[in-house]
């Protein structure tokens, strides 16, 4: 869940987001070490009078500053590629949900059910109940079972949109005429909020996404009541 003046990432609630958080920390540590080394060298150059104007060739130094950056890039690339492959894997999803972006709302269709589909609009500020979040609540939440692989098929009816839920590590473009897919799985129940992350017009800021992750038994009861 996000909170005001937050500087870090949202709490991870999916295996993919946990991997992304670890990769972020891993890369940030490398960047911090490189920045510290560069600042240290710059400070030495500014505070010492020693110079090497007569040095014309230094094979050892050139070898080091060629091999070292290559090794650093490999340390960053390997875990990044691993996560990319993990994000593309979809292993026997138990449920498929088709998501369509519109100006300016989302529509959802549970393709495994005969007639389970609805539109999801933002609740206006004047209609919010105590404790609800401004610009993030919707009239119809996307109810999904937790701890199970779910496939999202994402597209758009009009312009470019982007279906994003930060705490699940999801951000997939909704492109007219093209069907993108993403897989999600939540480790625990709860409400997870997102928003359209592609500028799509005057009401771009009013396209929230709310996922309600529940145990499988509650999801089955909900789906039965909706059909």
Swiss-Prot record:
<keyword id="KW-0496">Mitochondrion</keyword>
<comment type="function">
    <text>Component of the cytochrome c oxidase, the last enzyme in the mitochondrial electron transport chain which drives oxidative phosphorylation. The respiratory chain contains 3 multisubunit complexes succinate dehydrogenase (complex II, CII), ubiquinol-cytochrome c oxidoreductase (cytochrome b-c1 complex, complex III, CIII) and cytochrome c oxidase (complex IV, CIV), that cooperate to transfer electrons derived from NADH and succinate to molecular oxygen, creating an electrochemical gradient over the inner membrane that drives transmembrane transport and the ATP synthase.</text>
</comment>
<dbReference type="GO" id="GO:0042773">
    <property type="term" value="P:ATP synthesis coupled electron transport"/>
</dbReference>
<keyword id="KW-1133">Transmembrane helix</keyword>
<comment type="similarity">
    <text>Belongs to the cytochrome c oxidase subunit 2 family.</text>
</comment>
<feature type="binding site">
    <location>
        <position position="161"/>
    </location>
    <ligand>
        <name>Cu cation A1</name>
    </ligand>
</feature>
<feature type="topological domain" description="Mitochondrial intermembrane">
    <location>
        <begin position="1"/>
        <end position="14"/>
    </location>
</feature>
<dbReference type="InterPro" id="IPR045187">
    <property type="entry name" value="CcO_II"/>
</dbReference>
<dbReference type="GO" id="GO:0005743">
    <property type="term" value="C:mitochondrial inner membrane"/>
</dbReference>
<dbReference type="Pfam" id="PF02790">
    <property type="entry name" value="COX2_TM"/>
</dbReference>
<feature type="binding site">
    <location>
        <position position="200"/>
    </location>
    <ligand>
        <name>Cu cation A1</name>
    </ligand>
</feature>
<dbReference type="GO" id="GO:0004129">
    <property type="term" value="F:cytochrome-c oxidase activity"/>
</dbReference>
<feature type="binding site">
    <location>
        <position position="207"/>
    </location>
    <ligand>
        <name>Cu cation A1</name>
    </ligand>
</feature>
<feature type="binding site">
    <location>
        <position position="196"/>
    </location>
    <ligand>
        <name>Cu cation A2</name>
    </ligand>
</feature>
<keyword id="KW-0460">Magnesium</keyword>
<keyword id="KW-0813">Transport</keyword>
<keyword id="KW-0597">Phosphoprotein</keyword>
<dbReference type="InterPro" id="IPR008972">
    <property type="entry name" value="Cupredoxin"/>
</dbReference>
<keyword id="KW-0249">Electron transport</keyword>
<dbReference type="InterPro" id="IPR001505">
    <property type="entry name" value="Copper_CuA"/>
</dbReference>
<dbReference type="InterPro" id="IPR036257">
    <property type="entry name" value="Cyt_c_oxidase_su2_TM_sf"/>
</dbReference>
<keyword id="KW-0679">Respiratory chain</keyword>
<feature type="binding site">
    <location>
        <position position="198"/>
    </location>
    <ligand>
        <name>Mg(2+)</name>
    </ligand>
</feature>
<protein>
    <recommendedName>
        <fullName>Cytochrome c oxidase subunit 2</fullName>
        <ecNumber>7.1.1.9</ecNumber>
    </recommendedName>
</protein>
<feature type="transmembrane region" description="Helical; Name=I">
    <location>
        <begin position="15"/>
        <end position="45"/>
    </location>
</feature>
<feature type="transmembrane region" description="Helical; Name=II">
    <location>
        <begin position="60"/>
        <end position="87"/>
    </location>
</feature>
<keyword id="KW-0472">Membrane</keyword>
<dbReference type="GO" id="GO:0045277">
    <property type="term" value="C:respiratory chain complex IV"/>
</dbReference>
<feature type="topological domain" description="Mitochondrial matrix">
    <location>
        <begin position="46"/>
        <end position="59"/>
    </location>
</feature>
<keyword id="KW-0812">Transmembrane</keyword>
<feature type="modified residue" description="Phosphotyrosine">
    <location>
        <position position="218"/>
    </location>
</feature>
<keyword id="KW-0186">Copper</keyword>
<dbReference type="InterPro" id="IPR034210">
    <property type="entry name" value="CcO_II_C"/>
</dbReference>
<dbReference type="InterPro" id="IPR011759">
    <property type="entry name" value="Cyt_c_oxidase_su2_TM_dom"/>
</dbReference>
<feature type="binding site">
    <location>
        <position position="196"/>
    </location>
    <ligand>
        <name>Cu cation A1</name>
    </ligand>
</feature>
<keyword id="KW-0999">Mitochondrion inner membrane</keyword>
<feature type="binding site">
    <location>
        <position position="200"/>
    </location>
    <ligand>
        <name>Cu cation A2</name>
    </ligand>
</feature>
<dbReference type="InterPro" id="IPR002429">
    <property type="entry name" value="CcO_II-like_C"/>
</dbReference>
<feature type="binding site">
    <location>
        <position position="198"/>
    </location>
    <ligand>
        <name>Cu cation A2</name>
    </ligand>
</feature>
<feature type="binding site">
    <location>
        <position position="204"/>
    </location>
    <ligand>
        <name>Cu cation A2</name>
    </ligand>
</feature>
<keyword id="KW-1278">Translocase</keyword>
<dbReference type="Pfam" id="PF00116">
    <property type="entry name" value="COX2"/>
</dbReference>
């Amino acid at each position: 869940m996000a909170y005001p003046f937050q500087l870090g990432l949202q709490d991870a609630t999916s295996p993919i987001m946990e991997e992304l958080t670890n990769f972020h920390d891993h890369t940030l540590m490398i960047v911090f070490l490189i920045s510290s080394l560069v600042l240290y060298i710059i400070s030495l150059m500014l505070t010492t009078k020693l110079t090497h104007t007569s040095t014309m060739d230094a094979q050892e130094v050139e070898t080091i500053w060629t091999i070292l950056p290559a090794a650093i890039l490999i340390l960053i690339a390997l875990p990044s590629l691993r996560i990319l492959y993990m994000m593309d894997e979809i292993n026997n999803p138990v449920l498929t949900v088709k998501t369509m972006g519109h100006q300016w709302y989302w529509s959802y269709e549970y393709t495994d059910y005969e007639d389970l589909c609805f539109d999801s609009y933002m609740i206006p500020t004047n209609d919010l109940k105590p404790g609800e979040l401004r610009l993030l609540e919707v009239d119809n939440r996307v109810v999904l079972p937790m701890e199970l692989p779910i496939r999202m098929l994402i597209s758009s009816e009009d312009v470019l949109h982007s279906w994003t839920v930060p705490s699940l590590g999801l951000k997939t473009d909704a492109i007219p005429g093209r069907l993108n897919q993403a897989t999600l799985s939540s480790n625990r129940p709860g409400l997870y909020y997102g928003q359209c992350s592609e500028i799509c017009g005057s009401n771009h800021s009013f396209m929230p996404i709310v996922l309600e992750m529940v145990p499988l038994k509650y999801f089955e009861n909900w789906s039965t009541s909706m059909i």
